[in-house]
Amino acid sequence: MVALKNIDFVGRWRVWFAVSGVFLLICVGAIALGGFNPGIDFTGGSAFTASEVQGSPSTAEVREALPGDLGDRSIVQSVGEDGYEVRTPVLSEEGYTDAEVRQALEEELGAEVSVTSISPTFGGQIRTQALQSVAAALAIIVLFISVRFEFSFAMAAMVALIHDIFITMGFYAIVGREVNLVTVVAVLTVLGYSLYDTIIIFDRIRENAPEAGYNRQRYEELANNSIRQVVMRSIYTSVCTLIPVVALLIFGESTLSDFAFALLVGIAAGTYSSIFIAAPVLCLYKAWRAGRVGSGRRRAAQSASS
């Protein structure tokens, strides 16, 4: 705690930005080179689910039960202690029907199999709506902070939130986890959590800021003091939140595990960005804007005197 109280959060912004830059470079590289592993929610396809399977066949045996070479292009996962989920591409494009694949799996697993199918067109619509929901959330956040505080705070918060999105999705690309609607819900949850942490710091900065005049050194000092006043609260809150998230990641089934993974990465990135990115960006932007205003006034004075 004493060590955190002595950190120059704003003055050492180059260090914090460099750390984020390394992670962002890795994450953006993973997204650009490896891409995501989209689920059938976005690409279309069929998901076959079976529970209470007898005999505990291996995933390889389940894959071999699929007709033709469909097993080579399908994803087979164990679900819980005695269940399986098989995700296939669009079966009509492969020359099969849901009924044929379902019958083959029921014969292999000896259990009733349920199926959910999504057409490629509908999957594309879901993907578009998911992107629109994230964009709308970011736009509403900018509007809210601009009204509640001022635009400089909104701009700094937006930088931190975009940082969190890229880090979260980058880790998804690195580990190859499936990106589906659960991922979108998790990203929106991360945005809300990260924004809450950032607002706490911004609100303290605004409370401590002088009413009149701007002085860069004084503003950076009060920003540092404001962060120090709430930094332990942010860390304690994050740690307490991550404990059940880790439990979900370890013990949860596939859907809960995917959700928990996004929360784990996103909350960690959000806590870091709220403390080490948002406030320094705010101070740098205010200094840049003050410099522009000062330069404009000097040019106006020189023009008036000449």
PLM regions and their residue ranges:
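A structural signal for conserved, well-ordered secondary-structure elements
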Residues: M1-S306
